Amino acid sequence: MLVLRNLLALVTLALLFTLSSAQYTLSVSNSASGSKCTTAVSAKLNACNTGCLNSFNIVESSNGKGLVFKTFINAACSGEYESLSQFTCAANQKIPTTSYIVSCNSTPSSNSTTDSDSSSGSTVMIGLASSLLFAFATLLALF
């Protein structure tokens, strides 16, 4: 039984090591009325509507004191940020948390009932792959 337990622990540790550089999943959700931002998954920030997204911030790294964000601005609503819509956050960035917040701002659609100059915010949660969390939980359960 002890051998089996140790073997399970080694397999779990190997799984943790393998998945430590896995891609993080981004989801964008915005329920503000009049906004063209919609729910998006699989790191597709451009699902926040290519013609309407003004700017967004993405976690670039951690400087030891906090998270470093990179801001992409698309004031002309030209959709030029589309090529920057997929990101991989490697574990070697030494970000101590498994989820962090990124902002996503958009202007309302032209046929909405909100003021044309108003803007609404979205929250993007970047969460570590669930398989990695499962492996970590399994490791904790073994000890």
Curated annotation (Swiss-Prot):
Query: Which top-level group of life is the source organism from?
Result: Eukaryota
Cell compartment(s), UniProt: Cell membrane
Extent of the signal sequence: 1-22
Q: Which GO terms describe its biological process?
A: actin nucleation; sorocarp development
Question: Residue positions of GPI-like-anchor amidated serine lipidation?
Answer: S118
Q: Does the keyword Cell membrane apply?
A: yes
* Keywords of this entry: Actin-binding, Cell membrane, Disulfide bond, Glycoprotein, GPI-anchor, Lipoprotein, Membrane, Signal, Transmembrane, Transmembrane beta strand
* Free-text disruption phenotype from the record: Membranes isolated from axenically grown null cells have no detectable F-actin binding activity.
> What cellular-component terms does GO give this entry?
cell-cell junction; Golgi-associated vesicle; microtubule organizing center; plasma membrane; side of membrane
What is the predominant subcellular site recorded for this chain?
A: membrane
- Per the UniProt entry, the propeptide covers 119-143
Glycosylated residue positions: N111
**Post-translational modification, as annotated:** Disulfide bond(s) stabilize the native, actin-binding conformation of ponticulin.
Q: How does it sit in the membrane?
A: Multi-pass membrane protein; Lipid-anchor; GPI-anchor
Query: What's a Gene Ontology MF term here?
Result: carbohydrate binding
- Quaternary state and partners of this protein? Monomer.
Please report which protein family the annotation says this sequence is part of. Belongs to the ponticulin family.
Its biological purpose is as follows: Binds F-actin and nucleates actin assembly. Major high affinity link between the plasma membrane and the cortical actin network.
Question: Under which name does UniProt file this protein?
Answer: Ponticulin
Q: Which organism is it from?
A: Dictyostelium discoideum (Social amoeba)
Q: Which gene encodes it?
A: ponA
